[in-house]
Amino acid sequence: MNMRDLRDGHDTQKVPPRRSARQMWAVRVAWLLLALVAALYCAWRFAGPSPLQTDLLALLPATEADPVAEKAVDTLASALGDRTVLLVTSNDDAHAKAAAKQLGASLQKSGAFGSVTAELPPFDLAQIAALYMPYRFGLLAPVDRAALAGGATGSSSTTLRDTLAQRIYSPLNGGLTTPLADDPFGWLQRWLGGLPLATSNLEVEDNLLVAHRGAATSVLIVATLPGSAYETKTQRAVHAALAQSESALRQAFPDVSVARTGAVFYAESARSAAEREVHLIGVASLCGIALLMLWVFRSPRLLLLGFVSTALGIVCALAVTLLVFGKLHLLTLVFGASLIGEAVDYSIQYFVVYLGAQRDWDARRGARTVRPALTVALLTSLLGYAILMWVPFPALRQIACFAMVGITTAFASVLWLLPALLTRAPKRSPQRVFLGAARLLALWRRAIGGRRAAYVTALLLLVAIPGWLRLTSDDDIHLLIQRDPSLVAQEDKVRDAVGVDNSAQFFVVRGDTPEAVLQHAEALDVQLDALDGTANQVGAYQSVTQFVPSAKQQSEDRALLAKRVFDNPAALRATLLQAGFKDQVADAWLAAYAQAQAQPPLGVERWLAAPWSQPYRHLWLGEVDSATHAYAAVVIPQGVTPRNEPALLALAQRLPGVTFVDKAASVSKLFGAYRVDSGWWLGGALALVLVLLTMRYAPKEVPLGRAPKEVPSGHAPQKVPLRNRLRGGIATTLPVALAVGVTLAIFGYARVPLNLFNWLALMLVLGVGANYAVFLREGCLRADADLGAVWTGVLLSAATTLLSFGMLGMSAMPALKSFGATLALGIAVAVLLAPIGMPSESRRAA
């Protein structure tokens, strides 16, 4: 439909022929089939694995410039997301340990977990030394490397004798030790001492991981999930298993407490909260809208038809969103529940025309009457939602798709389905309501419309400007993702007991080969070590190169030993014999060195194959991009603070293949960039709405001295001045433009910091709020329109929308809360100012 068709729609007097009963039934059956197909598809999707997404990371866009780094972030999140940690605590040491064993056995028996580790299997630390023993001549601790490299040629034998004597006569050391015959100088033992095995407060007692803090004893239980932490089936199984096991535990050990942490608990909490909100918002919106429509229309039949149109929109929106995206995020589901108030607007406008026609009702003529207003309203709403499609946030794209399909389906059902269902004239009409609304509109229009609109605009701008100057922003992503406080407290308790901080920052190291990754990681390790003793130092860090040095480093260590130690085998053998080693022991050690020269260096695959490496395997991400054969690893520092983070970021920028990742900071930065861009998008969208409404409401060209309805064919038209051509579009756009400005001013005066979601909500204020002035102006363009009925429809539409989005403003999800509050405030102002868009009495015919 083009603009000329829209402009001429209200002048069309020709009444189309009535549809036959067969045509009516064909339309009804077609819509019924559409509804059945959409409903059956949704039922099929929800009958299998749940398509609901509870992963908060799914809300976020890619933030890393390097796609390999982005994939590394996802891989690490997936690896850590399937772990669940439980902490059993009591002031009675025996109770804590017994309770942990009972809880571990109960959870393992439940089948809800892939594995549960409470009691550690007997483990000999010699297994760790056994892995490295064949490669010991390429593994030197930094202190030994420095001693060998820094010694003068003549002093090397003296250094070796001192090292050998210290090794022989030093007291026995705990931890990882090596046999004297296999490691006479202690090089491997010192290298093993540098492994980051004990980076927590945990100790092994009675085959349990135990932490002591004051009088409390805490025992750690680690479990893995059989599926994704974000699958509803997994969440429910874990929840049920824990509830049953903890109930039995409280009966046996009343003094024991259990803290938990893991992605599955946050995901389950988010899903449950979202389901509660969907029910609350959906039921409250339905009940509120039903009461409003019954109060105004006094017709259960109209109420039912309105909800039929709305239900069609929501079911089709749900089906299309699942079809396009494959998944449905909880944020989209909650927003979809609030779409009820907007989707029912189109039905309300149709019902107002229906009741206003009284005995002269013709269903198809009624559809033609409301078509121009609904089409303009649909286009402005689609414009607001279409802008969300351009934002690279998956959840916002889902919301935009859901809303666009929903309101388009509701629009189509009003024009084609309702005329087939609403064929009989109304038995009664709420004329008293319409008359009261007409008087209210006349009073309010005299107060703010006509010539006074300019003064109202100037006054609002004068009041708003100081508020704009007080506007602030806060793009911190943590303010937009609400986590269950109880779960956060339990996570903090686990971290405090274990002794690991809450740092979510890490380095991603990439390379074209595993060797390149290891070399880049070693360069990073050197730089991190260099920060010790400075203001920018970090605590301990974990790096895969602490377990597997690069082949280059191992070759250099071999070369150093060959130059400084094994350059004179006879002298070395004599040194060993003088220290008391037997001939066969010295010969065996020298032979082992000779054999080691022919074997390849230690590789990552060999280390990964060792069972004891399991707790550290997340440090090696392996091949993250098969197309480019890119490999990656992570280096995780402890003690990252706002003070030293800039130094770490600068360090990563200096090193090849190294990226410092702070997902929260990256997303916050991206939020800020798009928040700034949103202001330009809003201005551009406002300009497009102005153009659209100007094309719709520009007066026609008429011959000089003729009224518009007096135009005979063949007369040359008179040019309409530019000001007059723009007047209608400006007047209709002005209410929503002022609504946006007033909303921003209120946030400024209230010192509420703005974020991206506030600005995106203003886009929808523009798209939805413009409808009210459009509905009023379209009513003025219809000669037979009852403006009281039109104003009733506008107020009812605004009330239903405010009800839905007002409920959204009470959401526990901060993103939706700011979204809904902004929408509700903007729409309230837009409907109050809508009469500004009405033409004066002298121009109504134009």
Feature-to-residue mapping (PLM):
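Signature of alpha-helical transmembrane segments and their immediate interfacial
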Residues: 2-7, 13-54, 419-420, 424, ...
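Hydrophobic transmembrane alpha-helices and their membrane-interface caps
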Residues: 303-349, 721, 725-775
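Pore- and gate-forming transmembrane helices of large, multi-pass membrane proteins
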Residues: 307, 359-391, 783-811
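Solvent-exposed, non-transmembrane loop/terminal regulatory segments of multi-pass membrane proteins
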Residues: 43-91, 197-209, 446-449, 454, ...
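Juxtamembrane segments of multi-pass membrane proteins
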Residues: 450-578
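Extracytoplasmic
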Residues: 63-68, 121-295, 299, 544-690, 722
